[in-house]
Amino acid sequence: MKAADVRSKSVDQLSDELVKLKKEQFNLRFQAATGQLEKTGRVTEVRRDIARVKTILREKSQAGK
């Protein structure tokens, strides 16, 4: 996910995206623990996407003040 794509979304969309990414991260963690995870790089990718979304949400909340 590109930062430009994240910035173009509304706060509600970003919140929904954050929930979706956290669920995916949870599932990936379980797959890794049970040895079923094939794409190990996806864990890092999802973690960074979560950080990106949180950063943009914080920027948008600070801009509103």
Swiss-Prot record:
- What are the disulfide bonds? none
Q: Does the keyword Ribonucleoprotein apply?
A: yes
The molecular function terms of the Gene Ontology recorded here are:
structural constituent of ribosome
Q: Which UniProt keywords apply?
A: Ribonucleoprotein, Ribosomal protein
Q: Which domain of life is it from?
A: Bacteria
Gene3D superfamilies the record matches: 1.10.287.310
InterPro entries according to UniProt: Ribosomal_protein_uL29 (IPR050063), Ribosomal_uL29 (IPR001854), Ribosomal_uL29_sf (IPR036049)
Which organism is this protein's natural source? Hyphomonas neptunium (strain ATCC 15444)
GO annotation, cellular component aspect: cytosolic large ribosomal subunit
Hey, which family's this protein in?
A: Belongs to the universal ribosomal protein uL29 family.
GO BP of this protein: translation
Pfam families associated with the record: Ribosomal_L29
* Encoding gene, per UniProt annotation: rpmC
- What protein name is recorded for this chain? Large ribosomal subunit protein uL29
